[in-house]
Amino acid sequence: MRRGALALLSLIAAAATAQETASGSDAEALAKQLANPVASLISVPFQNNWDFGYGRDDDGWRYTLNVQPVIPFSIGKNWNLISRTILPILYQDDVLPGTDESGLGDTVQSLFLSPKEPWPFGLVWGVGPVALLPTGTREVLSAEKWGAGPTLVALKQAGPWTAGVLANHIWSFAGDGDRDDVSTTFLQPFLNYTTKKATGFVLNTESTYDWQG
């Protein structure tokens, strides 16, 4: 089963930096850092997703608020380790016919090893492991499986534009034996435009392919 989602509103973020930021070019530079998933910057983005055509009969819909704290750790002169957590807060209706549910979903924890300086042609990248943690508060909101796999992100920033893609694949290795195994590929291309007044406009799409479906 392939599921598509459109993030209609993305990245209203609170950021903490070691330096004070001023208006103008400094604020614009900070906004561009926020557009980079592996920037050396502590941030807490909030992402709102609406999914339609969901569930057994394709009549359901789901709203998800993803809380996505990003915390960088310096590893020597040349590398950063970026912790990126996605904690979903969910409400869904008619995913199971005639029902509605709300609560926390499963947490996805990623770690990206990323060079501190861009590579040739301005390429920024990060690679590492991703883990699925069964933190869902209700059975219908959780896979009830532990999972792991690889993840990567690659992007380029040119002028006011940031374009890139984030991807991962997760296989389950433990959890409720009565639930289906997890084998999913996630793909998220994204495009960001930052104005001179440090306002960011973000468009991204999310696709998940369930190899067990």
Regions found by a protein language model. Give the residues of each.
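Transmembrane beta-barrel domains of Gram-negative outer membranes and organellar outer membranes
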Residues: 19-213
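Cleavable N-terminal export/targeting peptides
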Residues: 1-26
